[in-house]
Amino acid sequence: MGGKLSKKKKGYNVNDEKAKEKDKKAEGAATEEEGTPKESEPQAAAEPAEAKEGKEKPDQDAEGKAEEKEGEKDAAAAKEEAPKAEPEKTEGAAEAKAEPPKAPEQEQAAPGPAAGGEAPKAAEAAAAPAESAAPAAGEEPSKEEGEPKKTEAPAAPAAQETKSDGAPASDSKPGSSEAAPSSKETPAATEAPSSTPKAQGPAASAEEPKPVEAPAANSDQTVTVKE
């Protein structure tokens, strides 16, 4: 700019003022242009800062989302493990529930042999008076055999009563007649505890001995009369 002004001063003195004004305008425009970039630079600097903050925010959001996803995965895994543990508990409970019925079955099976063991005794005791009455009347043994079949549950009290009543019986042939009632009565006696529940067994044994006692006494009376 200085060279141009010097040339103008040398060659064109008339236009010096106009040239100076033009130079001033050009310098002012240049300063304005230089000023605007300076003003825009802070804005540009502010914009990258905002952009950086914006980028950091998505990163933080992404981290937060990742943590949330991990938390959800952990929760889902915990939920999945919980149902797995629950079926195990239910299986254990089912096994525990399945085992108690076995115990009653064993208990029911236990009185079976006991009743079966007592049933032959009752059959032998009942067969003794039946044999003594057999020469006199052949109908009484069949009646007596039919009655113990009806009263299978109270075999034990009947055995106790018939032992005391049938002990003095005197016969030399107890083999065949004893085997028949014992073979007929024992399966029925063994079936009774397995088919009847615990509650019904004692109730039946408590209620039914009365009708059993009567035929036992009647049979003893008939035996004594016929003897």
From Swiss-Prot:
Its GO CC terms are: cell junction; chromatin; cytoplasm; cytoskeleton; extracellular exosome; growth cone; nuclear matrix; nuclear speck
| Cellular compartments annotated | Cell membrane; Cell projection, Growth cone
Residues joined by cross-link Glycyl lysine isopeptide (Lys-Gly) (interchain with G-Cter in SUMO2): K25, K84, K97, K163
Keywords, ordered alphabetically: Cell membrane, Cell projection, Isopeptide bond, Lipoprotein, Membrane, Myristate, Phosphoprotein, Ubl conjugation
Bias type Polar residues, positions: 173-185, 218-227
Q: Which family does it belong to?
A: Belongs to the BASP1 family.
- Name the UniProt record assigns to this protein: Brain acid soluble protein 1
Species name: Homo sapiens (Human)
